Amino acid sequence: MTSKLEQLKQYTTVVADTGDFDAIARLKPVDATTNPSLLLKAAALPRYAEHLRQATAGSGGDAGLACDRFAVAVGKDILGVIPGRISTEVDARLSFDSEATLARAHRLIELYDEQGIDRERVLIKIASTWEGIRAAEILEREGIQTNLTLLFSFAQAVACADAGVFLISPFVGRIYDWYKKSENRDYAGAEDPGVQSVSRIYRYYKANGYKTVVMGASFRNLGQIEQLAGCDRLTISPDLLQQLADAQGELPRLLLPGEGEPRQVLDESAFRWQMNEDAMATEKLAEGIRLFARDQEKLEYQLATRH
């Protein structure tokens, strides 16, 4: 029998959630995603020492530019061993500034262009704030495709689809974490709140003819992945990808298009109200932005203090 990983690939595009080049080369995903936390881990790997040196040398003391140059260098390496796309993230500290997000996205695309990488192989990752979604809407009109991340609520998914973004990354595991702690109980299978969130979004998109790709992210266990077999894409850590590669047994498609809610359009006040009413999404979005910003600052410090 084929492994669960090979079976999953029959229904779902498998994406590696890592900046570890060697893991990607071994596990052969179609696409890869990075973020400031993963880049900080990658910076500790010996294979990236030269990229760190070059990123610093070419940035004129601008630590933010050095981070972007390092992210693009890692992305270029990864694109050499995958057939698809790399997702590279905008500085999370710009999450509430549409204009600054646009400027940083344009810079990332220019840096990839300097490396001979076509924009068709790059997704710009942006936090799913109201301001981030508005920036993504403009980028999509410019032909720059986006990946809206830190997505925890149905309201965020509705706004992203209405804006015509290329892809969203709803966070399964972090939703699960919040409910497990808040309700003081564990969840498994179809009862998992993170699984339920992605399933609801997926069916809403399919029922209403949205082209936006749903890519489940942030998994805590194989059960969550198995429940979402059939989702457009799943971005999975190397550890869980390896567990899938080693696992035998049936892996049926459990997520299928079905009845979805009627099409909605949210203006800014309705979006903010629905977010305000969702304690989990409000807390996890704020926490996610803080964590990515902190790791961005750590990476900038590391680059600024290199000798």
Swiss-Prot record:
Q: In which pathway does it act?
A: Carbohydrate degradation; pentose phosphate pathway; D-glyceraldehyde 3-phosphate and beta-D-fructose 6-phosphate from D-ribose 5-phosphate and D-xylulose 5-phosphate (non-oxidative stage): step 2/3
**Its Gene Ontology molecular function terms?**
transaldolase activity
**GO CC aspect terms:** cytosol
Q: Tell me the compartments it is located in.
A: Cytoplasm
Q: Give me any GO biological process, just one.
A: carbohydrate metabolic process
Checking InterPro entries in the record gives: Aldolase_TIM, TAL/FSA, Transaldolase_1, Transaldolase_AS
Query: Which family is it part of?
Result: Belongs to the transaldolase family. Type 1 subfamily.
Q: How does it assemble?
A: Homodimer.
Q: Which HAMAP family match?
A: Transaldolase_1 (MF_00492)
Protein name in UniProt:
Transaldolase
Query: Which species does this protein come from?
Result: Pseudomonas aeruginosa (strain UCBPP-PA14)
User: Which taxonomic lineage does the organism of this UniProt entry have?
Assistant: Bacteria, Pseudomonadati, Pseudomonadota, Gammaproteobacteria, Pseudomonadales
